[in-house]
Amino acid sequence: MKDDPIRIARASYEAYERKDRSAIEALIAEDFHFSSPLDNRLDRKTYFARCWPNSQRIAAFDFIRIVRDGERIFVTYEARNVDGTRFRNTELLTIHGHQIAEVEVYFGWSIPHPAPAGGFTNSSP
């Protein structure tokens, strides 16, 4: 796994499923940054304080797409929460060596989608 960025990415999601903090800590670089529509370049310490507690809600990730572009891995997944709700996101992980240096999360939608096929909802994100 040491030099395979796709395996490193997969291992990070597996650590979330297992709630294995020591496994995820070994995969996250000291100079790590995390961004999402709600978070702007959180450092490693803040990421673990703010985001790691969400692992308690995650039951599983089903990978739709995992694509490598050099040191970057694009991951689209459907996640299942322990309460049975589901959602879909896409993430861009940057791998340096054998650790994750950066994650960008792009929020997707709930499953099932709240809009009918061919339609839309009237609420804004």
Please place each PLM-identified region on the residue numbering:
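Short, well-structured alpha-helical segments
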Residues: 25, 44, 48-49
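Acidic-and-aromatic substrate-binding clefts and catalytic sites of carbohydrate-active enzymes
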Residues: 40-42
